[in-house]
Amino acid sequence: MIEVFLFGIVLGIIPITLAGLFVTAYLQYRRGDRLDV
C-alpha cells in the first residue's frame, strides 16, 4: 500500500511541477518581452 500511495503522490506532483515551471517561464518571457518593448 505504501508503494501505491507514494506512486500516486509522484503522479500528482509531476504535472503540478511541470505546470509551475511552464507558468513561471511564460511569465518571465512576457515580462522580458514587455521590458524590451
Swiss-Prot record:
Species, as recorded: Cuscuta exaltata
Annotated SUPFAM superfamilies: PetG subunit of the cytochrome b6f complex
Gene Ontology terms: biological process: cytochrome complex assembly; photosynthesis
Family membership: Belongs to the PetG family.
Name the UniProt record assigns to this protein: Cytochrome b6-f complex subunit 5
Subunit structure and binding partners: The 4 large subunits of the cytochrome b6-f complex are cytochrome b6, subunit IV (17 kDa polypeptide, PetD), cytochrome f and the Rieske protein, while the 4 small subunits are PetG, PetL, PetM and PetN. The complex functions as a dimer.
Membrane topology qualifier: Single-pass membrane protein
Spans through the membrane: 5-25
Role according to the record: Component of the cytochrome b6-f complex, which mediates electron transfer between photosystem II (PSII) and photosystem I (PSI), cyclic electron flow around PSI, and state transitions. PetG is required for either the stability or assembly of the cytochrome b6-f complex.
Example of a GO cellular component annotation carried by this entry: thylakoid membrane
GO molecular function: electron transporter, transferring electrons within cytochrome b6/f complex of photosystem II activity
InterPro entries given in the database record: Cyt_6/f_cplx_su5, Cyt_6/f_cplx_su5_sf
Keyword line: Electron transport, Membrane, Photosynthesis, Plastid, Transmembrane, Transmembrane helix, Transport
